[in-house]
Curated annotation (Swiss-Prot):
Keywords: Cytoplasm, Repeat, TPR repeat. Belongs to the CLU family. The gene is clu1. InterPro entries: CLU-central, CLU_dom, CLU_N, CLU_prot, GSKIP_dom_sf, TPR-like_helical_dom_sf, TPR_rpt. It comes from Aspergillus niger (strain ATCC MYA-4892 / CBS 513.88 / FGSC A1513). This is Clustered mitochondria protein homolog. Residues 318-562 form the Clu domain. Its main location: cytoplasm. May associate with the eukaryotic translation initiation factor 3 (eIF-3) complex.
Length: 1249
């Protein structure tokens, strides 16, 4: 147990555990040098001593945490540690404790409780004994932070020996939503019936003097109720009853007093110890990561959750649930009130000289941002619901501001007309989103002396809310003539302020963000020199710190986009370029500069050499050495002479006054235009080409598509342009075109839904969303959906906006078409709504709007409507079904229990009851850890330079830093686990690779979602590593799960699934499941042909593998045919001398000879009336071992003439005998294969198109 725990609590345990299996001696050495050692902790109760593995760099509080988490020391929460009789400070590093070394003994000393410690102890004990139910809050939704990994591993363990996970798998079947739902679990053992606060709280004043802190009541499994006093000395049973108050100690036969509540309950309940052990055993079956609490990240909220009727979602009575807020934050809630701004800025001012300083500072920063993001998101939800009183109630709704929990909130709308010329509310909404991105970039730069407010943007119920920490002095009324802002534009661009104190810090910021120093002019025509955009403001806080605000214009406007004529005007003028593009353009220009510089030097050298050619031979040898050196210097170019910075205020209404200024401004504009052109002429075509050639992983859904575009510096507004480029590339990029169009529709729907939702009263939100979804996705089931609205509730909201009721499928489609035209300058095809992929679109929309839907079989198609009487699937059956729905209203109740009450109404694809919850979507400005990233980069470089030992040490150091700074559950840590597992796999340390890949899967599931594209990739990696470690059956289970997820998020035939199917086929061959293996190769071939064409090298490679699979499956006729096809493609594409062509030729000869010998053998057997074929094991068994990776370069080529039919007839005749002579079962199998596999694959191809 201690080890498993350490793995979570102490990052350094992980490497120790990972390398332990492979290099015991090395590890021992490394442990000592790396500062890992073991100490003994002396305890006041059983087991009286424990050993803990610690690191000299960690703090004493980390050791405390280890003790609290260990099963043998669960009961301790209120204690301190002593060494040599001296108390140790919790916040010092172990290396600073005098004389502490390996095998030292420290003592755990129980402390007296105070009220806060007592409350925390009760919360902790409730969690430990399984008495705490789910906390219901407005940030974490249903099943937040879910992981399915354990359930899938368990399924493998339960499966029979002979079966493998893919034995009856149908690649073309429709997706099953059960894939992403938590599996039903056996109820956990119950240790106590209840632990709650007693009605006698709070403690009267006279008893507080005597050390009373809380009164509790505990009901044991035996049904006895005990009233307990929480006292400074511990816990004891008192004489209270429900009617009489007497909190003095009660004398009972058992021991009625203990320092820990856990120990006391064990004394009072005879069954407690056994049930508590059973509970721990049950918990230990799960991977610790799946139950570990979130500390530095917000858990992912799944879009699909079990319905309220399921046991997984059942609501249980628990009186303490409503008392938990008091237990966690005290009577007046003051413990959770923090001065966020002061915390942010003092953390920034912490020292950063040594590595230890930086670790401490970054760790604190990460925790602070996580706490702030969570608190700000909770407050934003309350603001959106109208539960917080505004500071300016007389203003219009959009102009109102709020303060809650020391966080300042405002709406992302143009309440006061600041953005009137830029596009009003639309511009304001975009500006606050860009502001968070800008603040995140500045936080990442970490400039000394420049401060940013804590900032979060929350989208909830159609409203965008900005939460910021309160900058001291921001509300201060200035003297007449003084500006509210100290640097930059004041209330627009009419007045411009400058301040000498801001120049140096803004200069550093602008240099790093590639922003050019430039002049701007106020309304009087007065010139001001600014380091940044006129929109970027500097404020001198009353705390003396320099704050930067409004960072939404750190990059220039996309001039070309604004000038391009669309059929309708773009909604706003905030279409700026992305920071990633500016960075990419800077690198592009720098490489041009370096090349030019090298060329210039070479030509200069050539001239100098020509001049020197006549010099005497005596000096030649001396010169040779200096020449080599100068060549090296020549290749090293000093880039200090290169600079590229862009003016963000170009084309934004600035009016230069003099000719010189106008010339400079024209030059700035030219540079910005070149950047815009670089995006259009280089970045976008390159991305399309990379996807066409298969050089980069293919996006699977809207999220992964957006990430890919943003990484390349492409704005989402270019979806339409990319869709056009993709179409021009032809059918190979059909999958991309489908995704791009789906993303445009989803985003257009989101804008429309937000418009409707903004002023809908809270009880009608589900009705509004379900009605709009029915208009988009359910028009086939019900062409005239009617919104379900409770008329009695409606009358309570006379001012509510119910305009969504008027939406119809036709009006919604027209609105979507208009939004797509305006926002993406793309025209949807005429019947676009008939080719929607309903489930994938529903998932995308749910994620974009924060919906959590109750799982059921959603019906988007008339043919899916369940029939009440035997009816065909044709038109008559549907008509009859509809007729019955209309006439027999009451009779329908019994047939569909999921919607028993709703059957009276016309059938709908989505009903309001399907929308169980709506969660806020949070955009934050948390910076990444630069220290952890530096260590990882240094490790990578060392490995590239073949310094394996140093490289691995640095990488493990980076892992340790990641876990220390971010905590275990964080997307950045998941990413690192993923990268490290690949590194270990490449260095052939398979066990370590599997261990890290497993962690990557669980952390990705819990932070990014059980069906995110990253989760699929993590499962596919894990399956490869499990197979390499010899656990092929487990590997196949992971592949099956990944394929099931793929069907939900993308559908069938994703371009990257070719590789996965091939891997599955090779794994099945490894298990000698030749028949199944062949089916997976055939499926892979089907997808490959549809994407790359019949004559591509990709197709030939798969044909080559399929031929081998057919030979192993005793179908030599098929094998010869496929190998001939492969040979012909290689021959026409690569020529006769290529290695692939020659290999295919050799195989073809062997397989043809084989086919002949089998046919002869079959004839003999038939003559003797034997019913089996004895295949030649030597030629077919041992030689056919297709290696993964027998692939040629990907080239699409011309179609070769049909030379494949060369010898087909003779082979046909020969192989007629095999069919007659083979066992009946084989014949049936072949028929089944011919009938079943191919048509289904064709069908799936059609449906995906």
């Amino acid at each position: 147990m201690a080890q498993t725990n350490g793995e979570l609590e102490h990052s350094k345990e992980t490497p120790e555990q990972l390398t332990n299996g492979n290099h015991p001696e090395e590890t021992q050495e490394e442990d000592n040098t790396g500062g890992l050692f073991q100490i003994t902790v002396k305890l006041p109760h059983e087991p009286y001593k424990i050993q803990v593995m610690v690191s000299s760099q960690e703090q004493v509080q980390d050791v405390r945490q280890s003790i609290v988490e260990l099963p043998s020391t669960f009961q301790y929460t209120c204690f301190h540690l002593e060494f040599n009789g001296q108390r140790i400070n919790d916040f010092v590093e172990l290396s600073e404790v005098p004389d502490l070394k390996a095998d030292s003994e420290i003592t755990l000393v129980e402390d007296p409780y105070n009220e806060k410690e007592a409350r925390m102890h009760v919360v902790r004990m409730r969690e430990l004994v399984g008495a705490a139910g789910d906390r219901v809050d407005n940030l974490h939704g249903i099943s937040a932070g879910l992981s399915l990994h354990d359930a899938i591993s368990a399924e493998v363990a339960d499966a029979s020996e002979k079966e493998h996970s893919l034995s009856k798998y149908d690649i073309t079947s429709s997706p099953s939503l059960k894939t992403i739902l938590p599996r039903a679990e056996a109820p956990l053992p119950k240790t106590v019936k209840a632990i709650s606060l007693s009605p006698w709280n709070p403690v009267p004043y006279h008893l507080r003097q005597k050390g009373h802190l809380l009164y509790l009541q505990v009901t044991t499994n035996e049904g006895e109720q005990f009233q307990i006093t929480s006292h400074i000395s511990g816990f004891y049973v008192n004489k209270n009853s429900n009617m009489k108050f007497d909190p003095s100690p009660k004398t009972i036969p058992k021991s009625g007093r203990a320092h820990s509540l856990l120990t006391l309950i064990a004394h009072l309940s005879p069954s407690f110890n056994a049930s508590f052990e059973a509970l721990q055993e049950s918990n230990n079956k799960k991977d610790l990561l799946t139950t570990f609490p979130f500390q530095n990240a917000i858990p992912n909220n799944p879009w699909l959750v079990p319905p309220p009727t399921s046991t997984a979602n059942a609501h249980q009575p628990d009186i303490t649930r409503s008392q938990e807020n008091y237990l966690i934050s005290g009577v007046d809630n003051a413990e959770t009130l923090r001065d966020w701004n002061e915390e942010f800025q003092t953390t920034r001012e912490l020292p950063r000289e040594t590595v230890q300083d930086r670790v401490f500072r970054e760790r604190l920063t990460s925790k602070l941002f996580a706490d702030y993001n969570e608190a700000a998101a909770r407050g934003a939800v309350l603001v959106a619901r109208g539960e917080v009183a505004p500071l300016n109630p007389t203003e219009s709704r959009d102009a109102q501001i709020f303060v809650y929990n020391n966080i300042f909130y405002s709406f992302g709308a143009d309440g006061v007309g600041t953005f009137a010329s830029e596009g009003g509310d639309e511009a304001a909404r975009v500006a606050v989103g860009k502001d968070v991105v800008g603040i995140k970039a500045v936080n990442q730069l970490d400039i000394n002396g420049l401060f940013t407010p804590g900032t979060v943007v929350v989208d909830y119920l159609g409203k965008r809310i900005v939460g910021q920490s309160i900058v001291p002095g921001i509300f201060k009324q200035r003297e007449p003539g003084e500006h509210q802002i100290d640097y930059g534009g004041v209330e627009g661009k009419d007045v411009v302020a400058t301040h000498p104190d801001f120049v140096s810090v803004f200069e550093k910021m602008s240099k790093a963000l590639r922003v050019k120093k430039h002049a701007v002019w106020d309304k009087e025509g007065q010139r001001h020199e600014l380091e940044g955009s006129v929109e970027t403001k500097g404020l001198l806080g009353t705390d003396g710190r320099k704050y930067v605000l409004d960072l939404y214009r750190v990059t220039p406007l996309d001039v070309m986009w604004q000038e391009e004529e669309g059929s309708d005007a773009y909604p706003h003028r905030m279409s700026v370029l992305r920071l990633e593009l500016v960075e990419s353009y800077w690198r592009h220009k720098m490489s041009q500069y370096v090349k030019a510089e090298v060329e210039r030097r070479r030509s200069a050298k050539a001239e100098a050499d020509a001049a020197k050619a006549e010099s005497s031979e005596a000096t030649e040898s001396k010169e040779q050495a200096s020449e080599e050196k100068s060549e090296e210097d020549q290749e090293r170019v000093d880039i200090s002479g290169f600079s590229l910075a862009l003016n963000p205020d170009v084309c934004s209404g600035q009016v230069p006054q003099t000719d010189e200024e106008k010339e400079q401004w024209a030059q700035d504009e030219k540079e910005v235009r070149e950047t815009c052109d670089y995006l259009r002429s280089k970045i976008m075509p390159e991305l399309i080409q990379d996807l066409h050639d298969g050089d980069v992983g293919f996006p699977m859904d809207g999220q992964s598509l957006s990430q890919l575009l943003h990484k390349r510096g492409i704005n989402i507004r270019y979806l339409g342009k990319l869709a056009q480029l993709s179409k021009e590339k032809g059918s190979r990029l059909d999958a991309l075109s489908t995704l791009l169009v789906q993303e445009m529709i989803a985003r257009a729907f989101k804008h429309i839904a937000n418009e409707y939702l903004r002023n809908v009263p809270a009880p009608f939100v589900a009705s509004c969303i379900s009605h709009l979804l029915n208009c988009l996705l359910g028009a086939d089931v019900n062409p005239n959906p009617v919104a379900e609205i409770d008329a009695s509730l409606r009358s309570i909201y006379p001012e509510g906006d119910f305009s969504f009721e008027k939406a119809t499928p036709a009006t919604l489609r027209a609105a979507i078409e208009k939004q797509v035209t305006i926002r993406y300058r793309f025209t949807l095809e005429a019947e676009w709504f008939n080719s929607l992929r309903h489930l994938q679109l529903l998932r995308d929309l749910s994620i974009k709007l924060g919906l959590q839907l109750g799982a059921r079989e959603f019906i988007f198609d008339k043919s899916q409507i369940p029939a009440k009487a035997p009816a065909t699937n044709g038109a008559n059956g549907v008509a009859q079904e509809e007729g019955k729905n209309k006439k027999k209203k009451k009779g329908g109740d019994s047939s569909s229990p999921a919607r028993a009450a709703k059957e009276e109404k016309p059938i709908l694809a989505i009903v309001p009851d399907d929308i169980l919850n709506i969660v806020p979507l949070v955009k934050d400005a948390s910076p990444r850890s630069s220290l952890a990233e530096e260590a990882l980069e240094a490790g990578r470089i060392s490995l590239m330079q073949n310094q394996k030992q140093l490289g691995q040490e640095l990488i493990l150091e980076s892992l340790s830093l990641h876990e220390q700074i971010y905590g275990i559950l964080h997307p950045e840590v998941a990413k690192l686990y993923h990268q490290l597992s690949m590194l270990y796999y490449q260095t052939d340390e398979k066990e370590a690779a599997v261990e890290l890949a497993r962690k990557a899967v669980i952390v990705t599931e819990r932070t990014l979602g059980v069906d995110s594209a990253d989760t699929i990739l993590s499962y596919l990696n894990l399956s490869l590593f499990e197979h390499a470690s010899g656990n092929t059956k487990t590997a196949l289970a992971y592949i099956k799960h990944a394929m099931d997820l793929w069907k939900i998020i993308y559908g069938a035939n994703h371009p990257d699934s070719i590789t996965t199917m091939n891997n599955a086929a090779v794994m099945l061959q490894h298990l000698k499941q030749y028949s199944d293996s062949r089916k997976w190769f055939e499926a892979s071939l089907e997808v490959c042909e549809s994407l790359f064409g019949r004559q591509s090298i990709n197709t030939a490679t798969i044909l080559f593998q399929l031929a081998q699979a057919l030979a192993l499956d005793q179908d030599s006729k098929g094998a010869v045919g496929k190998m001939r096809d492969a040979y012909n493609i290689f021959l026409s594409q690569l020529g006769p001398n290529d290695r692939n062509t020659k290999e295919a030729e050799t195989w073809l000869e062997q397989l043809t000879q084989n086919a002949v010998s089998i046919a002869k053998h079959a004839k003999d057997i038939q003559a003797r009336r034997l019913r089996r074929v004895n295949m030649n094991p030597r030629s077919l068994g041992t030689k056919i071992q297709p290696q993964v990776g027998q692939t040629a370069p990907e080239v699409a080529g011309a179609r070769a003439p049909g030379s494949a039919s060369l010898d087909s007839r003779s082979v046909d005749e020969l192989l007629k005998f095999i069919e007659g002579g083979d066992a009946g079962s084989s014949k049936a199998k072949q028929k089944k294969r011919a009938a079943a596999s191919n048509p289904k694959l064709r069908g799936s191809k059609k449906s995906s198109a």
